[in-house]
Amino acid sequence: MNNIRKTHPLMKIVNSSFIDLPAPSNISSWWNFGSLLGICLIAQILTGLFLAMHYTSDTMTAFSSVTHICRDVNYGWLIRYLHANGASMFFICLFLHVGRGLYYGSYMYLETWNIGVLLLFAVMATAFMGYVLPWGQMSFWGATVITNLLSAIPYIGTNLVEWIWGGFSVDKATLTRFFAFHFILPFIVAALAGIHLLFLHETGSNNPSGLDSDTDKIPFHPYYTIKDILGALIMITALSSLVLFSPDLLGDPDNYIPANPLNTPPHIKPEWYFLFAYAILRSIPNKLGGVLALVLSIAILAVIPLLHTAKQRSMMFRPLSQCLFWILVADLFTLTWIGGQPVEHPFVVIGQLASVIYFMLILLIMPATSMIENQLLKW
């Protein structure tokens, strides 16, 4: 009798993706983040669905409905904080996943990488719109400031902003459409993730050495299923600890004040995972220039394959590039810190320096260093 796992049309797809998938024998824990992101996405969709059952997207009742969820709904507080901190977990995994791709040269799989960049943009858009929904002070002013950036686009800017707002300011129409988009986008993200996997399975996974691993493959199950379960348990433990011990650690206290268009908070800032991009935006005095830099800070990932000048794929055996990679990581931490600081001396100058270093490292210093390494290796 034929094995149903290998003959059934649906099971065949599952089998070739998660069971009999040939995987390199030497992939490290840095390859766990794909599955962790999948778990994050499923958790966010499920908790979000239950929140949407009790949430009302109306300016008069949005804040109250979130309070109602936390106070009156069975385990509503748990669902709400799992959703809010689940987003933070999602971005931690995303940043580590992208960092892994940069370090080990996974960006050489062009289609997979470009879909990944699209995914990053989609998840960032989803998270931004989700932050607006509780309709606290930071929700309202964050939405006002970030959507207002589009007015920097020449000629159509002002019309575009008013079209997105559905009026002359962030109001009921804005909140309603943001809720609609926030609900639908995760399903688009799930579809994109499917395409991401489809392209990945065309080539197979990269590995830490960056060398071809076709001669030494092992089945995904049981080796990497067990490894992924361990990673998932560690992540779930971290998320549970955050949710149960300090659920507001990563949030802004201002968001516990209902939105008030007549009162601007002293420091308008987004969630921690956007602070690096926000710092780059603020470090440019010109509005349009700032918006371009903001978009480019993420879009620059798409051109990284074109900037790969090294003869080796991975950074595993390239100590100079390794040093620069960790300088880039330190620079991103610096930008994140600056994004949360007020716009005053010395933070402005530090932010400008960190922004210049960020773009210089990626566009100039790292490709040049790779060429020097080629020379040193006489390749």
UniProtKB/Swiss-Prot annotation:
Its cofactor is heme b. Its main location: mitochondrion. Binds 2 heme b groups non-covalently. Heme b b562 binds at H83, H182. One of its GO terms (molecular function) is ubiquinol-cytochrome-c reductase activity. Pfam families: Cytochrom_B_C, Cytochrome_B. Gene3D superfamilies: Cytochrome Bc1 Complex, Chain C. It is found in: Mitochondrion inner membrane. GO terms for biological process: mitochondrial electron transport, ubiquinol to cytochrome c. It is a multi-pass membrane protein. SUPFAM superfamilies: a domain/subunit of cytochrome bc1 complex (Ubiquinol-cytochrome c reductase), Transmembrane di-heme cytochromes. Keywords: Electron transport, Heme, Iron, Membrane, Metal-binding, Mitochondrion, Mitochondrion inner membrane, Respiratory chain, Transmembrane, Transmembrane helix, Transport, Ubiquinone. It comes from the Eukaryota. The chain crosses the membrane at residues 33-53, 77-98, 113-133, 178-198, 226-246, 288-308, 320-340, 347-367. A ubiquinone binds at H201. Heme b b566 binds at H97, H196. GO terms for cellular component: mitochondrial inner membrane; respiratory chain complex III. Component of the ubiquinol-cytochrome c reductase complex (complex III or cytochrome b-c1 complex) that is part of the mitochondrial respiratory chain. The b-c1 complex mediates electron transfer from ubiquinol to cytochrome c. Contributes to the generation of a proton gradient across the mitochondrial membrane that is then used for ATP synthesis. The cytochrome bc1 complex contains 11 subunits: 3 respiratory subunits (MT-CYB, CYC1 and UQCRFS1), 2 core proteins (UQCRC1 and UQCRC2) and 6 low-molecular weight proteins (UQCRH/QCR6, UQCRB/QCR7, UQCRQ/QCR8, UQCR10/QCR9, UQCR11/QCR10 and a cleavage product of UQCRFS1). This cytochrome bc1 complex then forms a dimer. Belongs to the cytochrome b family. Heme 1 (or BL or b562) is low-potential and absorbs at about 562 nm, and heme 2 (or BH or b566) is high-potential and absorbs at about 566 nm. PANTHER family: CYTOCHROME B. This is Cytochrome b. It comes from Crocidura lasiura (Ussuri white-toothed shrew). The lineage of its organism: Eukaryota, Metazoa, Chordata, Craniata, Vertebrata.
